[in-house]
Each structure stands twice: as structure tokens, then as C-alpha cells.
Amino acid sequence: MISLQIVKIPIERTRVLRENTKQIEKNANVKLSIEEENVIIEGDPYNEWRAVDVIKAIGRGFPINSALKLLNDEYILKIINLKEIFPRENQRRRYLARIIGTRGKVKKKLEEITGAEICIYGNTVSVIGRLNEAALAERAINLIIKGLGHSSVYFIIQKEKMRMLE
């Protein structure tokens, strides 16, 4: 049974998608059509469902190699939209800056601790990782959004990671 899904991505990310269409089609076993910011995915429902996350990840700024990990059932995509949390732009900018850190240090440290990949694009913070990794990264981001200090967040996340490994 062939079905159809439509996913919207930012127009400026369609170039990256166009350059990698064949690779995605081959790996996900789907057919892609790109019309401005709309991406039409055709294939069997399961492959379509997996390809939707790959397209969303590319739309949220991830490189193709990171996005293709989502074809593996062990990996998930989490998207946190700061526009839904903070109505004012100056608030969003401040919290995005806290998540990124000076020269990307906070983001890099969170990726090291959790094992997940984090991408900031527009008003969103997105995470790709295995279930536990993505959940830890999402928790860390939410703690930063709640206003906890970076060192407290690192401590809490490292402790939770150790508990998961037991």
C-alpha cells in the first residue's frame, strides 16, 4: 500500500534536501518531491513515517549524516520550540544563548555528556540520539530553560546518566 505524507521545512533548508534527495530515497526506500517548502513523501507507511523525521531533522538544521541516523529504529528526534515557551523574542534569544554558551561550549558539553547531537535553528532546539541520550539531552535543555546554572545541569545530567548505566 502506497501512501503520501507532506512535511513543511524552511525554504532555506530545501537546498540541502535537494542535494541529498537520492541518498534519502535510497536509504529510506521512499520517493521525495520538493515543492518550495513542502516535501512530499511517497512510499509504504512505515518507510514514510521514518523518512518524515529525517526530513524534519534536515529542516531543523542537522547535517544529512545525522538526519539519516533516524532511519535506525534506535534513534529518535526531539524538537523543542522555544516560541511555545517564551512569547517574547528577547526571552528566546537569551535562552538560546544559554543553551549554546560562549563559542558553543555549553552545547558541546551537553553533547559530550548525553551522547546526543543538538542543533539550534531559528526558535527551535532539536536533539537526535538513542532514546536515553535524547531524553537526557531534552532534560538538560529543559533544566537550562527553567533557569538552573550550567554546572548544576551538568551535575544532574551526569548523575542521571550514571544511574541509567547501572
Walk through the language-model features, giving the residues of each.
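Predominantly single-stranded RNA-binding modules in RNA-associated proteins
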Residues: 1-166
